[in-house]
From Swiss-Prot:
GO terms classed as biological process: apoptotic process; CD40 signaling pathway; cellular response to lipopolysaccharide; inflammatory response; interleukin-1-mediated signaling pathway; negative regulation of canonical NF-kappaB signal transduction; negative regulation of endothelial cell apoptotic process; positive regulation of B cell activation
GO molecular function: K63-linked polyubiquitin modification-dependent protein binding; protein kinase binding; zinc ion binding
Gene3D superfamilies: Nemo cc2-lz domain - 1d5 darpin complex
Name of the protein in its database record: TNFAIP3-interacting protein 2
Modified residues (Phosphoserine): 8
InterPro entries hit by this protein: EABR (IPR022008), NEMO_ZF (IPR034735)
Post-translational modification: In vitro phosphorylated by CHUK. Ubiquitinated; undergoes 'Lys-48'-linked polyubiquitination probably leading to constitutive proteasomal degradation which can be impaired by IKK-A/CHUK or IKBKB probably involving deubiquitination. Deubiquitinated by USP35; leading to stabilization and inhibition of TNFalpha-induced NF-kappa-B activation.
Zn finger (CCHC NOA-type) location: 398-430
PANTHER family hit by this protein: TNFAIP3-INTERACTING PROTEIN 2, TNFAIP3-INTERACTING PROTEIN COILED COIL FAMILY MEMBER
Subunit structure: Interacts with STK11/LKB1, TNFAIP3, IKBKG, NFKB1, MAP3K8, TEK, RIPK1, CHUK, IKBKB and SMARCD1. Interacts with polyubiquitin.
Amino acid sequence: MSSGDPRSGRQDGAPRAAAALCGLYHEAGQQLQRLKDQLAARDALIASLRTRLAALEGHTAPSLVDALLDQVERFREQLRRQEEGASETQLRQEVERLTERLEEKEREMQQLMSQPQHEQEKEVVLLRRSVAEKEKARAASDVLCRSLADETHQLRRTLAATAHMCQHLAKCLDERQCAQGDAGEKSPAELEQTSSDASGQSVIKKLQEENRLLKQKVTHVEDLNAKWQRYDASRDEYVKGLHAQLKRRQVPLEPELMKKEISRLNRQLEEKISDCAEANQELTAMRMSRDTALERVQMLEQQILAYKDDFKSERADRERAHSRIQELEEKIMSLMYQVSQRQDSREPGPCRIHTGNKTAKYLEMDALEHVTPGGWRPESRSQQMEPSAEGGHVCTAQRGQGDLQCPHCLRCFSDEQGEAFLRHLSECCQ
């Protein structure tokens, strides 16, 4: 059992290192988020300070505020570069290396099981490889610590420059307030200016307080750097312990312990693979649902446009139909009025009767041209008589001099039945 203790310590060290790296990565992300929030609050304070100082109509304060804004923009750009820097990439690479190392250990375990006669030599080679990998991980962590230290120094320099600008701004405001106090009597406008200076000083104090808080945050980052250094020291101790175990290694591992360790690593690998597969399935389902929703939205938009166009065209058709009906009704009323005038002005006699029949015929033809839909026109008198003879209607031959006749069914109406004739005409011609 003493031979299994070094191997268990070596195998438990990799998860501990990965957990430590993940914890430090999350702490760095939270620290960056807090710094972003503080920068947003300070931007708001600077904007309010700029609006208040605009009322002073000075030349020094606006330029200082512009310089302060430039400093804040540079600070924000540095934070953005820090977010997009190499720290996150290095941490991800470290996690990937740990995963690859687990896979390599599994393959080496399988090789050891297949060749039991060289277990001791292969175990020594495996330990040497693990030591080399630890050295590589140490080098990567050193690079990461150096990058974090550089970023910390940059933040401290930026904070110092910002504090210097704030102090200079406060000094200028104090000088202006002293100059205004020595001017003698103060007008109402000067009193307002003094109050605005006091408010500007209060804002500057708030800004200084924010700078103090940012310095505290920088101190916290330095503490994180110290944690990294302690982690490096503990890792060095772990590597030294591995070297000592390698030197003291003389008895090969028992086959049962090796089998248990291989099975445990296989279970871990299967769990990781299943988690990755589930994540890929969820991502695929989300993408498919998003594409389906987008297609549905586009289809609904096209349907809405089509319905809108149909509604507009139908409304235009209805308006044209109503206008056409009104025009036809007006023409029919005018024709009826002309017919009534002609009937009132005619006199009895064979000659007058003949003229009246002819006039009624022309009026009837004119009414048919305006009322009958589909472009139907009576061509001749003989064509009008044919359907009446076939259908048994003989009212055309028996019409009086002022009678009205339907052009569709050849039904006759007297002069007093003008309204009935119009109703029949509208129903028969539909």
